[in-house]
């Protein structure tokens, strides 16, 4: 059975050539400050929900380990110091975070692989699987993104968690009540009710994306200045960076 991840499927639309380098050539990538920052806050929340850190320890752990965990510079910005802004946002969140009283933790960084179509499976990690005080199941995803810029953008991000609901149904025999984005830099929870219609849309998208990937013979680059210069894992080695075919 061939296995895909949501991030892999999504990356095909960001840049097919980067997808090719990562998933087909399996070329080694370099990291970026945004990824390292997000992973670090994920790590802290994982430690808290697994009982490895107490609430009062979170901010101190963040301050003590930030430079070690996020050694790369953030991109330059004409209006703000992104590195300082991200640091301050993360610290403010962890200093004010009060936990999730009344919620039962069902899983933390829960890894799974489930079949989605004939011959295909989805591999993923659920950041936090919860049971709320009413007994309903909630899928929570921690996001360093401060906010969604549009309804369409929010729906695109939500596809991932709707697909992850397949694991919940397989494991618990029922669908989650809602999916939640913990946009921790803004200290807000973005809640979306689960519907089978939204799940079907996500499945259709996944199927169409897999079909597009498997029928692709020309792995074209989709160069953009910010992505190519600061985000792409192949920004120092790509032969087609920002449209250059040399």
What residue spans do the PLM features occupy?
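RecB-family 4Fe-4S metal-dependent nuclease core
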Residues: 1-246
């Amino acid at each position: 059975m061939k296995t895909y991840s949501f991030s892999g499927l999504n990356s095909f639309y960001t840049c097919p050539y980067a997808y090719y380098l990562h998933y087909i050539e399996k070329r080694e990538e370099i990291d970026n400050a945004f990824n390292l920052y997000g992973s670090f806050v994920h790590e802290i929340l994982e430690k808290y929900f697994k009982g490895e850190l107490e609430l009062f320890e979170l901010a101190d752990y963040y301050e003590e380990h930030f430079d070690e965990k996020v050694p790369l510079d953030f991109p330059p910005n004409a209006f703000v110091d992104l590195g300082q802004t991200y640091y301050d946002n993360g610290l403010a969140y962890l200093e004010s975070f009060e936990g999730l009283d009344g919620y039962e933790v069902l899983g933390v960084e829960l890894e799974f692989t489930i079949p989605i179509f004939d011959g295909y499976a989805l591999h993923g990690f659920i950041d936090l699987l919860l049971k709320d005080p009413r007994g309903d199941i909630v899928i929570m995803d921690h996001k360093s993104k401060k906010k969604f810029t549009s309804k369409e953008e929010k729906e695109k991000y939500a596809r991932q968690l709707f697909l992850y609901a397949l694991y919940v149904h397989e494991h618990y025999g029922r669908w989650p009540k809602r999916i939640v984005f913990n946009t921790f830099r803004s200290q807000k929870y973005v809640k979306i009710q689960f519907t089978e219609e939204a799940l079907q849309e996500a499945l259709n998208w996944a199927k169409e994306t897999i079909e597009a990937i498997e029928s692709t013979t020309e792995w074209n680059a989709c160069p953009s200045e910010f992505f190519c210069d600061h985000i792409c894992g192949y920004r120092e080695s790509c032969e087609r960076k920002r449209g250059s075919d040399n």
